[in-house]
Amino acid sequence: MFTVRRECNNGPVAFDSRFHRLLLGLAFIVLCPVHSYTQSKALLEFRKLEQQNWLEHANSARVSTDQSNFDVRFYHLNLNLSMTAPYLQADLICRFNAIENNTAFIKLNLRREFTIDSIRGNISNFQFSLDTITVTLDRPFQAGDSGWVQIYYRGVPPVANGLKGLRYVTHAADQPLIVSLSTPFLAHYWWPCKDGPGDKPDSVLVDITIPDTTVAGIPVIAVSNGVLANVIQSNNKKTFQWRERYPIVPYYVMVAVSNYRDFHQTFTGTHGEQFPLDYYAFDESLAGAQLGVVDLPAAIELFSALFGVYPFRNEKYGMTELGFYGAIENQTNTIINTMDISWFWVSVHELAHMWFGDMITCKDWHHGWLNEGFATYCEALWAEHTGGFDLYKSYMQTLKYQDGGTVHLQDISNPFGIFVSIIYDKGAYVLHMLRGVLGDSVFFASLADYAANQNFRYGHATTEDFQVVCETTSQQDLDFFFEQWIYDEYYPMYGYNYSQNTSTGETNIYIRQLQADFGRRPVFTMPIELKFLFQDGGDTVITVWNNQQTQTFTLTLPKVISGFEFDPNRWILSTSQVVAVGRESSTLPARFSLEQNYPNPFNGVSNFELRIAEASHIKVLIFDILGNEVATLVDEVRQPGVYRIPWNSGANPSGIYFCQFSAGVFSQTRKIALVR
């Protein structure tokens, strides 16, 4: 058992993701001046690199091939690595079952830079082109038939976008490091496989042969997923035999080779489960790593209590230092830039993936929020665990995503169609809102039921699967919720007010949803909390069911109201402002702002929502990526209010543009994407 320490300096919150986290991050600098600042930078870097993952997937997905006719059951990867040059000699055994009758061939992914020396097994011949190995089988396979192939290959592993693949780099200036970075579709950059999230072999064996040597007086070792079964020494070489016996997607298979210093803990949970925590750090950062993982067992205990015991408890949980990049939730062995305390919130995120991402994997990247939104939400749950509900609420406000696009990704083959931060931030906020709709007990029971469901454990799930679990647990129809928050875009923009007859206590609450004025969904159906403050110092909270564009709710309150808070716990992703009752167009913004254009990306006309807090001479200008002004949308005095400003892109070519809104000393810029 482990005790969570709750002091400020042991539980700082990292507020970083995208630029709208900055203000709250500054507030926490006052409370935790050192740690919140360093964590903020760490998480910011992590998020940027995670966004790059999706762009890599979008490009890689274009060359993927139909592989639905077979199911991989087992891989055995045998790697022979040079420590002095980026060169790989290897072989792979793949065992599979045919899914369709008369299966004549199977296709595996492997980058074209490699040379295939031979293939044996159930094969008559093969072709290798366009990053695809097409193996013609030695007979027609019927559904359920088992087969195998063994591929011998060699070459220099290519690097994806200058960053990922099987990387040969150094740490401490000149000490070698070989490490794989394979998410979300890049395992085939270094080994043949059926890449992507859709296929999980039952187990993977990884043998890594390296020179038997030391660097800076420290032995070079090789680490991977699962359990180290054996180390064989022969002919001045060592072979590390790693065994992953749980189902795993190919891009979570990992290797890391360096002169690591390893240290260990043993986790003992409340259910009696016990497993090793194995850490691999560089000598120069060992002390910081040992300090940085002190609270990790407490995070494991928290997530085990919420979602069920750690899903890979028969093996381990490990973390391996990179010294660059961000982090990847490789199954049982997360790779991470550094394990020091400044990256602890990244460690929490990656740990959560062991339940949501590794154990239960999104069926395809349309449902990517089931991986990333869940892990991001777990950051907020850790904040709540260490700092209470107020800290949780504050953390959630750093995740408010108020741009366009759907959480269910529509187009995963087009980089412009992937709204990267939406699956992290809005995905997490969807769970926050679902908690508000269901209540704590039912919400957390739904998450636990989802994690325990045998249809998804060590397999795949879709958004529809998650919805069914929530509906079954809650005994509620949640179509309204998922339809508007997952499959539709944007958010409600509330105008509200109230009045009270102090003699009778009769109170009217007026709510109008304003977003239809900007071409968006006219009504979001949600329960809304309303908090009334009374002159005697008391308060009460009531919940109303808002399902119309304009609604008035009447109730009797026995005390005189002194104040009113709309959605005090911020359960709803929204904007809200006081409006004059009966004058629906009289919305008075409290601040200047330029909202993200919609649609975005767009072809033809896109609209901007402009909020003007006071009468001002304003300018709204469009610039291309080179800084050339291409359009003036507004250049005049405007009165306070909310305006919709269209831009007809005309003959402007596809590309990235910027919309700049200025009013006096205020200035704000939005990036927009024009796609022809």
Which residues does each PLM region occupy?
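Extended, low-hydrophobicity, Ser/Thr/Pro/Gly-biased non-transmembrane segments
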Residues: 42-62, 66-67, 93, 150-260
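Glycine-centered coil/turn sites that cap beta-strands in beta-rich domains
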Residues: 583-622, 644-650, 663
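Zinc-dependent metallopeptidase catalytic helix centered on the HExxH motif
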Residues: 335-393
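N-terminal, polar/Ser/Thr-rich
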Residues: 37-89, 173, 478-480, 484
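Short, surface-exposed loop/turn motifs with a glycine/proline- and acidic-biased composition
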Residues: 633-665, 669
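Acidic/His/Gly-enriched intrinsically disordered linker/tail segments
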Residues: 367-368, 372-437, 454-457
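Hydrophobic helix-coil surface modules that form long, contiguous segments used
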Residues: 90, 195-348, 377
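Amphipathic alpha-helical substructures
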Residues: 100, 420-509
